[in-house]
């Protein structure tokens, strides 16, 4: 068993894609399509570059393990991709790669985040051994394109004058999450959209959507309502607006929430 100093991005993407299709190996931060994974690794993975953010373990010249850290250099934190391991001595390989990658990152990472399928028992045990704290459990819902287009009252794309209210609500509802309010504003683009529900110039709620048309991928990243606007149908209207927007893209068939 050895770690190679020469990394091949296509090999990494292919290995993760195959492993991530299996619930017992699944990591929620990454998909299971090779081309999409390769694009993410090369263009949207880790502030320190993908080469410094992965370790790959081999045995008899075959990959048996991949571990990646999607590093945020400013926050000194990382989302954990893996460990993806195809070996009998799973824990031994996992701890070996963890040690190697920790030493490879050029600074101390203060916080790690894991997001694993409920059937991924190996990674759950590893997190426990590393003294990780479980923050919560989440369901991923998939919606198919059967939505009719219609006008939704009081919901529209966020304008700059609403950003301050949005940041305050978002940071209050999600105090320790992967994107703070100002980071979401910075990520807005022709495809990444923030929709808000307003009443009397007050923010009732919002939904933030990211779309990658190239891979026909869409995610509703955040949805929340202000405390005094709950149980009034605001969340439902926001969700409808987000779904309609996503399915307005040609070829979009399903959404993950």
What are these regions (language model features)?
Residues 37, 151-218:
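Flexible, substrate/cofactor-facing loop regions flanked by secondary structure
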Residues 90-103, 225, 231-244:
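Conserved acetyl-CoA-binding loop-helix of GNAT-fold acetyltransferases
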Residues 118-136, 236:
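Conserved active-site alpha-helix within GNAT-family acetyltransferase domains
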Residues 133-145:
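Conserved catalytic-core motifs of GNAT/GCN5-like acyltransferases
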Residues 1-39, 138, 148-177:
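Short amphipathic alpha-helix that is part of the acyltransferase structural core
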Residues 31, 36-96, 207-226:
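Conserved donor-binding loop and adjoining core beta-sheet/short helix segment
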Residues 105-117, 246-257:
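Conserved GNAT acetyl-CoA-binding A-motif
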């Amino acid at each position: 068993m050895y770690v190679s100093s020469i990394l091949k991005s296509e090999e990494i993407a292919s290995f993760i894609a195959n492993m991530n299709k299996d619930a017992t190996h699944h990591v929620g931060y990454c998909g299971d399509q090779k081309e999409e994974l390769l694009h993410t690794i090369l263009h949207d993975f880790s502030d320190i570059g993908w080469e410094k953010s992965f370790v790959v373990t081999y045995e008899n010249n075959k990959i048996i393990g991949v571990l990646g850290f999607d590093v945020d250099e400013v926050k000194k934190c990382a989302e954990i991709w893996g460990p993806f391991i195809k070996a009998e001595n799973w824990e031994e390989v996992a701890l070996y790669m963890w040690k190697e990658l920790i030493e490879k990152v050029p600074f101390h990472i203060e916080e790690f985040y894991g997001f694993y399928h409920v059937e991924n028992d190996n990674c759950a045990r590893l997190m426990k051994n590393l003294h990780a704290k479980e923050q919560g459990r989440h369901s991923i819902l998939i919606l198919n394109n059967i939505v009719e287009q219609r006008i939704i009252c009081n919901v529209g794309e966020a304008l700059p004058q609403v950003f301050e209210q949005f940041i305050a609500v978002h940071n209050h509802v999600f105090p320790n999450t992967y994107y703070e309010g100002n980071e979401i504003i910075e990520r807005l683009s022709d495809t990444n959209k923030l929709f808000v529900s307003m009443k009397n110039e007050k923010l009732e709620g919002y939904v933030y959507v990211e779309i990658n048309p190239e891979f026909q991928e869409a995610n509703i990243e955040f949805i929340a309502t202000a405390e005094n606007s709950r149980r009034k149908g605001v969340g439902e209207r926001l969700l409808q607006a987000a779904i309609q927007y996503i399915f307005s893209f040609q070829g979009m068939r399903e959404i993950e929430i």
